[in-house]
């Protein structure tokens, strides 16, 4: 309780999220519930390395229950109160809990508003609590992993606007770009995706602690649209003052834009690209179409290469004939046999070996 108070979390928020505490003992759950099979299956127990018993997975940690859409607890996140590592520990994958599909705080967000206008995606449990505490009750967190495609789909089924919030360091920028790449082919007209990169080393919790609710909202208003983030990221790699830079930007951007479903959003992205490379949209789209057609034609040519007919040399035919009809050896005269021994053609050595094998073993057949 003291730790939560130090972090600015009220009793009301702790109650809303059903925060708990796992005692430091190694056998609290076994003493309380006895049934080790269910506890093991749910990930709350860990089997000892010598297989001689079990111990509690979560010890001396604040517990964050993770709920599914119906509010059922399917897993836990645990935060240490000491310097113990790891700082955060999640339930393992179980039949109920798949951390790549779940989002902490989504149930609580939808309890406030069944169809929220927007959802902020953050990286930590405490970030979610801090945002709810600051009366911004539309925050969810990934569960210690990179944002997955399944999580993006789940978010899109819950709201029309998603704001992905990351630390502004290199790792945060890379994580944000991965989210953008995974989102493109899911994006349809009507959805809004924005990207908020906080100052290096900051997260929503720390911003609210230092600058309050208004400080975070100021950052929120600066969140980049998908188009702004996409082109800002790509422009770092090119020099638009050079013709080659414009061509490279188009080469990098077009495959990404084409992943977006055909519609207004895709057209607007092409418009922005056209403006950056000083082309009109129609010409840019035509170049894209021509490149596609050329790629298809090249592939078709590769697929339609004429078969090369297999031509057999006389020596190869002789070996095949002898192997198929070994009785031929009996009909050859001594003079013909001597002629065979003087052959110096590719494959003649194999022909002679086969000939003498059949000569010495007349009972051999092609079978």
Language-model regions, residue ranges each:
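Terminal amphipathic helices with adjacent charged low-complexity linkers/tails
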Residues: 14-21, 266, 271-299
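C-terminal or mid-to-C-terminal helical accessory/interaction module adjacent to the motor/catalytic core
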Residues: 190-280
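Structured, non-catalytic alpha/beta "coupling" segments that mediate domain-domain communication
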Residues: 57-79, 205-212, 216-218, 279-283, ...
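Non-catalytic protein-protein interaction segments used by genome-maintenance enzymes to assemble
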Residues: 229, 290-363
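Conserved phosphate/pyrophosphate-binding and hydrolysis machinery centered on Walker-type P-loop NTPases
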Residues: 19-23, 57-59, 122, 239-250, ...
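Non-catalytic interaction/clamp surfaces of large macromolecular machines
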Residues: 1-15
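Conserved catalytic cores of soluble enzyme domains
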Residues: 114, 145-200, 207-213
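Phosphate-handling DNA/RNA-contact segment within nucleic-acid enzymes
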Residues: 23-158, 162, 175-176
């Amino acid at each position: 309780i003291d730790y939560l108070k130090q972090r600015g979390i009220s009793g009301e928020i702790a109650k809303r999220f059903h925060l708990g505490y796992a005692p430091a003992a190694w056998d609290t759950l076994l003493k309380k519930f006895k049934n080790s099979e269910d506890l093991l299956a749910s990930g709350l127990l860990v089997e000892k390395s010598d297989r001689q018993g079990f111990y509690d997975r979560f010890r001396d940690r604040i517990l964050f229950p993770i709920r599914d859409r119906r509010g059922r607890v399917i897993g836990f996140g645990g935060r240490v109160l000491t310097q113990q590592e790891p700082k955060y520990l999640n339930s393992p994958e179980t039949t109920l809990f798949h951390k790549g599909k779940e989002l902490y705080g989504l149930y609580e967000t939808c309890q406030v508003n069944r169809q929220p206008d927007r959802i902020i995606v953050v990286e930590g449990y405490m970030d979610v609590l801090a945002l709810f505490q600051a009366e911004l009750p539309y925050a969810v967190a990934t569960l210690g992993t990179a944002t997955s495609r399944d999580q993006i789909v789940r978010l899109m089924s819950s709201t029309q606007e998603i704001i992905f919030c990351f630390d502004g360091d290199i790792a945060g920028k890379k994580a944000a770009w991965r989210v953008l790449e995974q989102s493109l082919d899911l994006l349809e007209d009507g959805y809004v995706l924005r990207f908020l990169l906080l100052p290096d080393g900051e997260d929503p919790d720390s911003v609210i602690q230092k600058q309050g609710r208004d400080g975070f909202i100021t950052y929120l208003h600066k969140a980049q649209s998908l188009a702004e983030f996409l082109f800002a990221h790509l422009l770092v790699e090119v020099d638009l003052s050079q013709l080659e830079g414009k061509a490279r930007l188009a080469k990098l951007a077009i495959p990404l834009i084409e992943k977006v479903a055909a519609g207004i959003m895709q057209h607007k992205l092409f418009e922005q690209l056209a403006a950056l490379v000083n082309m009109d949209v129609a010409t840019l789209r035509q170049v894209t179409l021509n490149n596609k057609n050329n790629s298809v034609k090249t592939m078709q040519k590769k697929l339609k290469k004429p078969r090369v007919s297999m031509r057999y040399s006389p020596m190869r035919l002789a070996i095949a004939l002898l192997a198929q009809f070994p009785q031929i050896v009996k009909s050859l005269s001594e003079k013909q046999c001597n002629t065979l021994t003087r052959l110096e053609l590719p494959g003649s050595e194999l022909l002679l070996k086969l000939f003498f094998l059949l000569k010495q073993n007349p009972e051999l057949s092609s079978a």
